[in-house]
């Protein structure tokens, strides 16, 4: 939680225009916190509330040589025990996948118990993999596969209990040559409940369609009263 925003940020319906970040972090600059380089408006929030805020025409690119891990989002990169309410994003976020990235139109990675409500994104989200990531293994350096996770609202959540309610996604998700669960609301979620959510676009896919989900790949929880383009409903 060191360096995280803690408290209440009320945007009072203001809009941040043209948020720009094309920066990355290389391994030679690593510190004890594993270089959690931040690209979103809020790099990290902890026990916080962010509400009533819009971001329009964002332009975020995470370079291929970036070695920081985990969450990348337009509004928040890393979210812990926090709440986001009545916020939206437009623009684009593009991830290079030198190391795993969890990329979301609103928030990148959720840690612990979190709530996101009354939010939407129409952002273009892109994941890429250049096949040039090597890691130290027994016997020397070996090429490694990278496991990204991309979602219209949230990239991924692995711990805690999360509720995403009254949210919708209307942008696009493009994944090029990468192993990645892809979802219109969340890429991968464990302990995530989705309620009253909508995916209003068919522009969602990756090289392996078996990893693509209208709402998201969710374990241990479910979705209620949610809709996606083929007019099906999941209860």
Question: Residues of each region from the PLM?
Answer:
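Predominantly extracellular beta-rich ligand-binding scaffolds that present long acidic/polar faces
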Residues: 1-235
């Amino acid at each position: 939680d060191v360096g995280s925003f803690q408290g209440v940020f009320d945007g009072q319906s203001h809009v941040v225009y043209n948020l720009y970040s094309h920066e990355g972090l290389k391994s030679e600059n690593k510190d004890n916190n594993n270089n959690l380089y931040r690209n979103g408006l809020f790099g990290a929030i902890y026990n916080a509330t962010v509400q009533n805020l819009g971001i329009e025409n964002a332009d975020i690119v995470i370079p291929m040589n970036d070695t920081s891990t985990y969450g990348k989002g337009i509004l928040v990169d890393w979210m812990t025990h926090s709440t986001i309410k009545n916020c939206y994003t437009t623009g684009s976020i593009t991830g290079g996948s030198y190391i795993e990235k969890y990329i979301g139109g609103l928030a990148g990675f959720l840690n612990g118990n979190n709530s996101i409500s009354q939010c939407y994104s129409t952002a273009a989200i892109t994941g890429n993999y250049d096949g040039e990531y090597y890691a130290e293994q027994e016997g020397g350096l070996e090429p490694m596969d990278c496991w990204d996770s991309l979602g219209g609202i949230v990239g991924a959540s692995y711990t805690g209990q999360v509720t995403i309610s009254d949210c919708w996604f209307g942008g696009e998700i493009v994944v090029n040559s990468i192993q990645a669960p892809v979802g219109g609301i969340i890429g991968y979620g464990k302990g995530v409940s989705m309620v009253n959510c909508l995916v209003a676009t068919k522009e969602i896919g990756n090289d392996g369609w078996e990893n693509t989900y209208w709402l998201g790949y969710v374990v241990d929880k479910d979705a209620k009263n949610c809709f996606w383009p083929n007019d099906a409903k999941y209860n």
